[in-house]
Amino acid sequence: MNSIKFPVLDRTTKNSVISTTLNDLSNWSRLSSLWPLLYGTSCCFIEFASLIGSRFDFDRYGLVPRSSPRQADLILTAGTVTMKMAPSLVRLYEQMPEPKYVIAMGACTITGGMFSTDSYSTVRGVDKLIPVDVYLPGCPPKPEAVIDAITKLRKKIAREIYKDRIRPQQGNRCFTTNHKFFVVRSPHTGNYDQELLYAPSSTSEISTETFFKYKSPVSSNELVN
């Protein structure tokens, strides 16, 4: 049944009895029906959209795009991920049921791309937010490369043991860099204290000696000293 990696059909048995394990049966059913959640933010996602056409026909892999994270088991991130979008991406990943997989598509998603040099708001790699199963480099990668990444993910699922995958997630989830996001009050509320904004500056607290000291001209000798 599992035609990707291990043949689970025992040909020595009679009467065409199929013998397999529950783990292989689960892997075979999941690799043949991946439901991706498309998270496209930039030009790399246009290349993935080419797979929907009849030329590449990604339906043969059982891919059914979903619009809800609770119905998806694969999230494909394509494009630049900013600091403002990072909490939304993490929330979508957390809402996906287990087991779930991630494909990072494009240089901007993997390393930040050309925006990682002088941009203060770009995440330098989506693996700092969520764990990535398959990296797909390119700017942008071709549709054939996307098919190859999906094939590699199917091979990974075929030889996967479910208990080994959920065990690290039950412990401490630690990635390369922890981005700490805190919900703070917006500073632009429109309610400002008008008395503080338009209060005239008072010089009554400045002493007379200090006022005339800095008002008088300073000689060159005093500047050197």
Curated annotation (Swiss-Prot):
The lineage of its organism: Eukaryota, Viridiplantae, Streptophyta, Embryophyta, Tracheophyta. Binds 1 [4Fe-4S] cluster. NDH shuttles electrons from NAD(P)H:plastoquinone, via FMN and iron-sulfur (Fe-S) centers, to quinones in the photosynthetic chain and possibly in a chloroplast respiratory chain. The immediate electron acceptor for the enzyme in this species is believed to be plastoquinone. Couples the redox reaction to proton translocation, and thus conserves the redox energy in a proton gradient. InterPro entries: NADH_UbQ_OxRdtase-like_20kDa, NADH_UQ_OxRdtase_20Kd_su. This is NAD(P)H-quinone oxidoreductase subunit K, chloroplastic. It comes from the Eukaryota. Keywords: 4Fe-4S, Chloroplast, Iron, Iron-sulfur, Membrane, Metal-binding, NAD, NADP, Plastid, Plastoquinone, Quinone, Thylakoid, Translocase, Transport. It is a peripheral membrane protein. Its main location: plastid. Its cofactor is [4Fe-4S] cluster.
